[in-house]
Amino acid sequence: MPCTCGNWRKWIRPLVVLLYILGLIVGVPICIWKLQKMEVGVHTKAWFIAGIFVLMTIPISLWGILQHLVHYTQPELQKPIIRILWMVPIYSVDSWIALKYPDIAIYVDTCRECYEAYVIYNFMIFLLNYLTNRCPNLALVLEAKDQQRHLPPLCCCPPWAMGDVLLFRCKLGVLQYTVVRPVTTVIALICQLTGVYGEGDFSVKNAWTYLVIINNVSQVFAMYCLVLFYKVLKEELNPIQPVGKFLCVKMVVFVSFWQAVFIAILVKAGVISNTWEWKRVQDVATGLQDFIICVEMFLAAVAHHYSFTYKPYVQEAEEGSCFDSFLAMWDISDIRADISEQVRNVGRTVLGRPRKMFFNDDPEQNEHTSLLSSSTQDPISAASSIPPSPSGHYQGFGQTITPQTTPTAATIPEELYSADSPEADLQVADHSKVSDDSCNHLDS
C-alpha cells in the first residue's frame, strides 16, 4: 500500500509503539547479558543505570515528534519545533554511547554540542516565524516602541536602533553561534588527533582551555540576543507562552555546558581523583558528565513534551504523504539560505555598502523571504500555502484560527498616513496603536 494513503495518520503511531516494544524486547536482554558477562564495576553500573533513563527518555521525545508530524498543519512553526525536540534523544543516546566507549567520547560529544547551536538558532526562527505571521510589519511595530537599552552586562553599550537594525543584530547574534560552534568542533577534533586537545584539563598548553572560552563567549552572546529579543517583543510573544520554551532550551544548553566546566574544576582541584575502571581522571570527568546528561534528558523530555506540545496545531489537515512529512523534518534548505543571506549582509556592512532592508514596502521581500519562500519550502509547506489564506496561526492556549484573508503589509489604514486626517494626529500621539493594529489585524 503506498505511503500516500489517506489513513497513514491512523497506523503510524501504533507502528512506532510496536517497533519500540520490539526494541525493548531485544535490547534489554542484551544489556542484562552484557552486565552479567562483564566484571561489574562503577563504570558498568553507571552505563546500565544511564541506559534505563535513555529507554524512558526516547519514547517521550519520539512521541512528541510523531504527533507534530501527524498534525503537521503549520510547517513554518512546527519545523523548528521538531528540530528542537530532536535535541533530547540526540543528547541522550550520544551521552550513553560516550559513557560506554570513553575512547570515542570526544568525537560523539562534539557532535552533540554542535546540535545545541542548531537548537538555539531554530528557537530564534520559531519566534521570528510566529511574529512574521502575526505581525507582517514587524519592523514598524518595533519602531513604534520605546527605545530598548542593553541588558547587563552590556548596559553601557549604545542601544541598537529599534526596527530592522535590532532584528538583524539579534538574529546575527544567534546565528554566529551556529557558525562558531561547528568551527571550534572541527578544531577540537584536529587538536585531539594531534594530541594537544587535553579535554577537561585547564592548562595554557591545552587547546581545550581556549576553545571552552571561545564557545562560552559565543554561547552567552547568543543567549543574550535571545533574551533581548524576547524583552523587546514580550507582549507580542505572550500568546505562545515563550518563557517555558525558552527555559527548556536554555536549561539544557547552559546546564550541560556549565556542569562540564564545574566537573573539570573539581578534577583540577583534586576533588575527583579516583579513576575506577577509567584510564585517566579526565575520562572519569567526561563519564560523569555523560551519565548526568542521560539522567537530565529524562527530565528534559518531560518538560519538552508539555512546553512544545502539538495540541495547538490539531486541526483538519490537508491530505498529504507521510513520506513528505518525514522529509520535511530533515529539510535544512531554509538554514542554508538564511546563513547565505546573513553572510552577504555582513559583507555589505564590512565593505561599507548599504545593507539590504529587511522590512520594506514589498511584503514579498523581507528578512524572512529566505526562510519562507517557495524555493526553500518543504513539500508540506508548499501544500499548505496553496489556499489564499494561511494555514492558521498559533494564538496560544490551545486555539488555532484560520484567517479568511491573506495578510499583507498594508495593515495600517491609509488615512493614518495622511497628515490632514485626525487619525494621523492620534497616531503621532500614541505610537503604541501602530503596534496593536499591526499585530492584531489577523485576530479580527
Curated annotation (Swiss-Prot):
Membrane topology: Multi-pass membrane protein
GO cellular component: membrane
SMART domains, sorted: Solute_trans_a (SM01417)
Database matches in InterPro entries: Ostalpha/TMEM184C (IPR005178)
Residue stretches spanning the membrane: 15-35, 46-66, 84-104, 182-202, 210-230, 252-272, 284-304
Biased composition (Low complexity): 399-411
Ranges of biased composition (kind: Polar residues): 368-378
Compartments reported by the entry: Membrane
Ranges where the record places region Disordered: 357-411
Domain of life: Eukaryota
GO molecular function: transmembrane transporter activity
Keyword annotations of the record: Membrane, Transmembrane, Transmembrane helix
Family matches, as Pfam families: Solute_trans_a
Task of the protein: May play a role in cell growth.
Family to which this protein belongs: Belongs to the TMEM184 family.
Name this protein carries in UniProt: Transmembrane protein 184C
Organism: Xenopus laevis (African clawed frog)
Lineage: Eukaryota, Metazoa, Chordata, Craniata, Vertebrata
